[in-house]
Amino acid sequence: MKIFEESWEVCNKVGGIYTVLSSKAEHLVKKYGNDYFLIGPYKKNIIEFVEEDIPFELEQIYKNLLNRGILLHYGYWDIRGKPKVFLIEFYDFFKREINYWKYKYWEWYQIDSLNSDYTYDEPFAWSVAVGIFLEELDKIYNFNKILHAHEWLSGGTILYIKAKKLNYKTIFTTHGTVIGRTLSSKNIDVMKIIDKIDADKEAYSLNIHYKHQMEKNTAKYCDVFTTVSEILSIESEKFLGRKPDKIIYNSLSLEERDIKKEFLISRKWLEEFILWYFMPYYEIDLKNTIFMYTIGRYEFYNKGIDLIIDLMKYLNKSDINKNIILFLFIPTGVSGISGNVLKLYNSYLFLKEFFESEKTEIIKHLIRREYDKIKQLFEDYLPKISKNSKPSIVTHDLYEKTDIILNKLIESGLDNEEKDKVKVVYAPIYIGQDIIFNLPKEKILRGFDIGIFLSRYEPFGYTALENVYYGIPTIISNKTGFSLSLKNKNLESKYILLVDIDNFNDELEKIKDFILFISSLEFEKYLEAKKEIYNIAKFYDWKNEINEYIHIYETLNNLQ
């Protein structure tokens, strides 16, 4: 048996599915070795993909695909387990054949994509190209094969397999329905009106009918249909017309950790950031400061970003006797690091280096109380700050000048004035892919006091689970699949606050009290809290949960 797992997010960081795949891959490699492969789209400048020569037995397939405008890349994903990967470069194929295949999928499945846009056409063309590749494999491999596809973006491959009657058993996993995500992005509470929604009609009114039809047909024709939470199971049955065969919670690949050491290392980075980003403008009492963050895709209403900003506005005007610095890690289009921010960062790096090189001289002047000479040494290298200026809200120059997050922050009076109790750092980039935020994500986030996730639409909620894995006190919406799973597993904790976002204004004082409670913990008590939170994450370990998928694979293998 060979297993092929397909997703648009293989070696391509977009959202939570990237974490699903990258965190469980090592367990599937351990079980299936070289019989497990991942398939994704080929993108230029992929950091984590290590390309290798095409295997000898696939050379003819490589040539056949090339004649169709499909370029096959082979190698491994440079993560734990180093799973083998096929990445499909398909843009020549896209240009040549997109209209033909849109017609064929109308003929086969009545998918109405005549007026579809690029957000459909691009992954659709890729999924067909993957289908053609798997068809070529089917000609030379007679043994049992399984395709496990994620989200509607991979759905075209399953439908290709079924239309061509290829020798593959298929699994489809959805992580959120097209209709649910779209309605929620318009600030509509899907679960409140789910019984009133005619999904097929609604899809046309929202102009997402082609994505919905792809998703619905994939759910209908796959051999096994799975999803990641009870909420999404209800949604799938209503919108896609099929109840999932299995709910399998997302998990992480966990390892024992030194929580105290990790926290202190990350905290040092965080305090150093505040030193160069804020301190040139005004003093911040770090001992009286609470560091909070949120992280996720740029979905303003779905991720509850507006609610987080409303909370900060409330706290800024409240009687809270703490400083709060909120980091918003929400990637979007940027042209580069803001000029002023880059100057501050470079000045700080130079000062650090200069201090090390002149340390003996500086100590000599200190001993002799020659403070003016120390000032003279550094004067030329200190950043020049104009009068009445303040730290930038956003770290990078945004392509979109009417950025909704930035505008909401400014409208809410969160503009980093010295008098503000709440300061904000809006970082619109992926952590670890930037010279300012140049460490792996976990090495930055572990230094925060509280993570906050107030999603309206979050069928599972990986960011909150990762926060729990880091041992960080968590504020989480009651609408997420993860928060409901905590209840189902009886894993509630006083260090994890569930927020009723339907009655958000009534919850504000409760959230403030939670923040004050966390900030009041003595360091040793705080470490105990972190260990308690981390222990909750152990109930979401792929080491155990992966067996759910393995059982499905083995069952399908026995049916072939």
Regions found by a protein language model. Name each.
Residues 1-560:
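Catalytic cores of nucleotide-sugar-dependent glycosyltransferases that transfer UDP/GDP/TDP-activated
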